[in-house]
Amino acid sequence: LPESIFLISIRDPLQHAFSLLKQHLNFCKLQRDDDFIRRYMNYIGHNEFGLNHIPLNKPIRYNDFNHINYWLEQWLFFYENIYNNYQSYQNCHFVIYERLDNLRYITKLLENLDLNKNKNLKLNYFQISTNKKIESQYDNNIYRKTKLVYENFLKLNR
């Protein structure tokens, strides 16, 4: 797709993994309370979260879907693959979630995408609540690995 533009959002791995874990636990509760939700999600092929979760990547060290380490490992597999295979593509743009509340960042992103022609765009749309304190215990080793990948994306995005 040579004429396509791909926007790939990147979020701080610990914050992202915690958010994914919360969604997973939320869907597990919903599906335990109402089996129709579980069956419907299966029917439409949405197994990203919940009782019938299917990993996007085969877990290596962390198999417990109800623990943040599992979601950190999944983050690592996914974004390491994206970085290694797509970082040199001119039509792939990596959008750093934590910077979406920065007006200069948004303006530069729109200029790079040649989308800054509409001066009526509301550029201060995002209010990012970052750096939430994560209460879950996590493996610092897997977290360090995810941070290295995240920092590689930050370097691309200057």
Where are these regions (language model features)?
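Short hydrophobic/aromatic-enriched beta-strand-loop microsegments
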Residues: S4-R11, K29-L30, K117-N120
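Conserved phosphate-donor/acceptor-positioning beta-strand/loop module used by diverse small-molecule
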Residues: L1-Q23
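Conserved N-terminal glycine/acidic-rich loop preference
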Residues: Q15-G45
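PAPS-dependent sulfotransferases, especially Golgi type II membrane carbohydrate sulfotransferases
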Residues: I44-R158
